[in-house]
UniProtKB/Swiss-Prot annotation:
Documented EC number(s): 1.4.1.2
Record key words, sorted: NAD, Oxidoreductase
Source species taxonomy: Bacteria, Bacillati, Actinomycetota, Actinomycetes, Mycobacteriales
Protein name: NAD-specific glutamate dehydrogenase
Keyword Oxidoreductase: yes
Amino acid sequence: MTIDPGAKQDVEAWTTFTASADIPDWISKAYIDSYRGPRDDSSEATKAAEASWLPASLLTPAMLGAHYRLGRHRAAGESCVAVYRADDPAGFGPALQVVAEHGGMLMDSVTVLLHRLGIAYAAILTPVFDVHRSPTGELLRIEPKAEGTSPHLGEAWMHVALSPAVDHKGLAEVERLLPKVLADVQRVATDATALIATLSELAGEVESNAGGRFSAPDRQDVGELLRWLGDGNFLLLGYQRCRVADGMVYGEGSSGMGVLRGRTGSRPRLTDDDKLLVLAQARVGSYLRYGAYPYAIAVREYVDGSVVEHRFVGLFSVAAMNADVLEIPTISRRVREALAMAESDPSHPGQLLLDVIQTVPRPELFTLSAQRLLTMARAVVDLGSQRQALLFLRADRLQYFVSCLVYMPRDRYTTAVRMQFEDILVREFGGTRLEFTARVSESPWALMHFMVRLPEVGVAGEGAAAPPVDVSEANRIRIQGLLTEAARTWADRLIGAAAAAGSVGQADAMHYAAAFSEAYKQAVTPADAIGDIAVITELTDDSVKLVFSERDEQGVAQLTWFLGGRTASLSQLLPMLQSMGVVVLEERPFSVTRPDGLPVWIYQFKISPHPTIPLAPTVAERAATAHRFAEAVTAIWHGRVEIDRFNELVMRAGLTWQQVVLLRAYAKYLRQAGFPYSQSYIESVLNEHPATVRSLVDLFEALFVPVPSGSASNRDAQAAAAAVAADIDALVSLDTDRILRAFASLVQATLRTNYFVTRQGSARCRDVLALKLNAQLIDELPLPRPRYEIFVYSPRVEGVHLRFGPVARGGLRWSDRRDDFRTEILGLVKAQAVKNAVIVPVGAKGGFVVKRPPLPTGDPAADRDATRAEGVACYQLFISGLLDVTDNVDHATASVNPPPEVVRRDGDDAYLVVAADKGTATFSDIANDVAKSYGFWLGDAFASGGSVGYDHKAMGITARGAWEAVKRHFREIGIDTQTQDFTVVGIGDMSGDVFGNGMLLSKHIRLIAAFDHRHIFLDPNPDAAVSWAERRRMFELPRSSWSDYDRSLISEGGGVYSREQKAIPLSAQVRAVLGIDGSVDGGAAEMAPPNLIRAILRAPVDLLFNGGIGTYIKAESESDADVGDRANDPVRVNANQVRAKVIGEGGNLGVTALGRVEFDLSGGRINTDALDNSAGVDCSDHEVNIKILIDSLVSAGTVKADERTQLLESMTDEVAQLVLADNEDQNDLMGTSRANAASLLPVHAMQIKYLVAERGVNRELEALPSEKEIARRSEAGIGLTSPELATLMAHVKLGLKEEVLATELPDQDVFASRLPRYFPTALRERFTPEIRSHQLRREIVTTMLINDLVDTAGITYAFRIAEDVGVTPIDAVRTYVATDAIFGVGHIWRRIRAANLPIALSDRLTLDTRRLIDRAGRWLLNYRPQPLAVGAEINRFAAMVKALTPRMSEWLRGDDKAIVEKTAAEFASQGVPEDLAYRVSTGLYRYSLLDIIDIADIADIDAAEVADTYFALMDRLGTDGLLTAVSQLPRHDRWHSLARLAIRDDIYGALRSLCFDVLAVGEPGESSEQKIAEWEHLSASRVARARRTLDDIRASGQKDLATLSVAARQIRRMTRTSGRGISG
């Protein structure tokens, strides 16, 4: 743009811009193109990025306006400067602006000033314009800088954007100094030509020695040097001619140029008579160019008897500082002289010396003589072998500085070493500051040049002199020694320390000297590193070592943590340390590699104990604490200890980490027991009471430390228990009291532990702690409490094993309920206890959780494998923990061997068996391998179902057992599942054991729907045969799912769908078959998977078969939370919504206990899962007991080891038959119990009340009805439901088994004779003697006996007998065995079942037979000596009953005979074999054979004669009608029942007495009728009175309790004798 100088306005165009868009492009481009950022070392990309936006952001109208106003007037040779503070109204501060003549040093000088003042800048814009001004400096024209020459003056318009952080003081300094700097810049620029000319002219005069004024030996060299300097090697900043007087020089102001223009005053002289040219360095740094300290070159001249110094001030160029020494005048001559002197020394080659000289800073070379150069060069050449620092000193002649040249081996040079050198040199010379340059090249040495600036002394011009600097040889050597020591590397010191210590070899020391990182070397002294190396040497792969050092009075210590072969992050390590109760103040990680290649990580921590943890008072105690601390942290690192605040007890209570683990295990157990306090609160309580904690540990150790017999351990335990009690009694807080008392209770309740076991291979050696507990002593445990409990704890796995008796069995579950797995197991063991009622062992259950599952990798297959592997490992640890505290049995002697190193506070306990469960279905072989590793006496009988054993899935045994229940239910409603089609919905898939086998047990199944966790299967109108075949195919297909079902075989409207789908289409056929009412869902065409599953569960089908996992049906009164199966909450339904006729429970917990009751009360048919799927446990129990027998045979050599497997396999089918027989028996029992449930409700109510009071049964836990509910049902005429009856049956069996085992009954031949029948034929036939000595013979005999009793005689038999007669249940057992043998009850029962009769008929036959059992049992208890000699009674009665029974038809008369024949004919007409029909029909008459045989013995009369008389008398008196009427009396309560029994007993008793009377009056040879007639004649009055009363009763038709009581009394009045005699 052009400015009209005549314009009147003062505001030019640059000041009129109002927006960035107004700025002409050429102005913007000029500014932007000149941008310079503050970071010259930035990458080009960074600079480009900055240049793309920063300058443009600075270029504002306000900035341009201000700049223009600044440059509107500038006189020639002047510079305009403006400084803007941050709050300047201009709006773009802080900033500074300059308008000056363009010059090369302008920008550099400005940036040097800013740097020197410590002022940061963001950007510098220095556009150069062609400017035309008026003579007075007024701006006339400003244009872009033209290419080439321009008639106008080039001006630099500089704008510097300063950092916002700049302070006012800094800006003031800029404002003060910048004009002076710019003035110097202007002077240098103005005088540049004159300066060069002056130097050139002086050079010529020196060379020619004009007028003899420059005489000196080196005159020629000086002249050449001056020309060399003027040839671009020296940037001239100023010149002045000075006269010399009295050792000072005085400047001639008129001669000054550049920065020396106008300079006056005096300065010290530089030259002398011997030196024509002297080089010196200024005291003050220059602001010009790059801000270095300028050099002064003084040339002496003699003028008229006086001395003049020509002084040039300037800076050596970069080229000069790097010029070849042989090309620099003056220097080159000295160098050549030095090299010439060295030619005679072959040990120092000239080239090598020259290389050294080339490294010397060029200004220094001007001061060195040839000899000095040679000496220095030789010393440097020798430096490589000496491995030390080499120092050369030169003091400035004016004492401004000391020049220090330091050479050292290149490999010793580091920034740290250089900084140490700086400190030493500044300190030794008393310097104020220091500059340095360093040169590190390919040569073997490094060079550092330090300029130590000395303090100013005196005032210039007053002639004051600084004290001389000591640069003597002695001082040089001394300081050189200091530098050498500082230059000694850490490695040098390490090698020296290793040699002095002798514990680390030189080779290792040299290795570690190189291997340790610089960070390590800075943090660790070489002496301490020697100790670290010793630790490192001992490490192995994946090992750890902790070392304490430097503990101060406040407890702050240094902990060094060494890891071999494995690294860790600080985030991993810090929680470990913090859990110990310490505060980590500082941490430093290092790493090093051992000579053998093992990587080692070293972590240094500064730690102090938590303020609440007191320091140990003595050194010894502190050392012991440190040792325990290190061991504990080491254990934490190895995963042997968990990270929590229990670890603080190591320091607080002085415990070892093992003792802490013990307390943590007890705490974990309490949490599993439902303890109301959180773990963190428990931790706090224990940490706050270290003395009590110590006492608890002392108590535990007193109880369980293995000690020789006769020791004082018991006394120690009593004292420790007293100490614990005293500590707790002194507590004030109730919460604290409860927590610590709970710990004390657990310790006292502990029966065994593997805590002190050291045997290799034990679980304890793998950090597993097992605690066997007497649960009955632990008040904090919920009910029910098992008899034995083993809690297994480790950081990797936790688990619990609950047993309700010494011989107990149940599965081990892989639980996913880490927080409450004991609750889960307790719930399962209740069902297991009931399920085990049919087998030898009582209920047990175990479960474990995996605490450290592998982290997911994203590969599902790999994740599954990893998860399974960890589960197997934890399963093995869990079982090992159980075995650590379990007794063993010596096969040879059958003696019990306690586990080694285990103190037993209980008796022998060697029976431990396990079974598969959820998550462990395929783990049997794994469990058996663990048992074998312990030499456990059960071998592979420890876990049934292994590779050598009975494969439940292959046998289909669980499903087949469950199917017996299904068949029984359907028979009761008139459906034969094996011949008639029926509809089914199911839970499971065909790959599963129970569901897969179950859905193949009838070819008439019409499976319309099923689901598992993956799919939903729908087949609304299946073909039974076709679908059965497809299910069979899928069952045989490995790992099949419903998705493998052949879609072409599915009926119209069906399909297979993933449960992951959002919605599943609903066909009309599916809606119809599932009974989905359109009013519910509005007839939607699709349904979400959860809703469809609920519809399947509610489908109106014949059977709902559960073969899956999960709880799908609950009672309406229960919430989903009550169920405890969150995964199935979305699909669960209420039992009263289920429309299936029958539910078969092949799987566990498919229906809640209350849900079963609700389903039954709603009209459905269901048992319990424990009953339905008991075949699995029954089969496993047979397997265990068979293996125990066979293993004893193998040990004895009776059976060869290689015969064992074949023998087991050969019995598979018969074992299945034995198991299924148990299922059939139980289901028949359940059927008859259901049929009579209403009538027997009063008895059942009393029985439940007895079990609650005497056996500890919990109604709520067992889902048995309350007394209020029983009363409600009584009024409604409803009895116990089938699930309640099943539970009652189980508890009856369990109770009876326990009572029988406590007696000698199982050892008596009359009871034990049934033992062989438990085993398959192959064993019975070959090894009967060995069977009789079976390890569990008593338990097996008892189980068989009680199963037989309850299944045959009924659930209430033993209870009723005991209650009615006033005897014990054991007496009832005795009478049952006697009755069974005497009357062949078992044979009759088996024939009834084998006849395959209609359910109603078979139930009637069974109940009639039970009446015989009941009455015969009471008779034996009333008329035979007690306790009953069972064997003797059988011998007395059995043969006679068997002989007399076929003649019953001869003796029965009249109505009695007619009733029997009618009943038998009725039975026979319905398919009962005639002999069986007659045998059952005469059952109650056969009962009288006991009286008949007894009377015959007492009266010494033939039993046949007595029988004829007895039955004739019965007919004569019509007692059978009375007895029938008695049987029909109600049993509202116990008293009604007892009244019935009393009347019946009175009638039978009277009949017995009358028989005695009749036989007494009769004569031999008379018929029974004649004898009765004679008796009536002799007793006419009594008989007549009685007959009249009996006739009146019959005539009235009233047969209630009162009339029948009178009738019984009238019959009694006919008698003359008691008839109560007992024969021998």
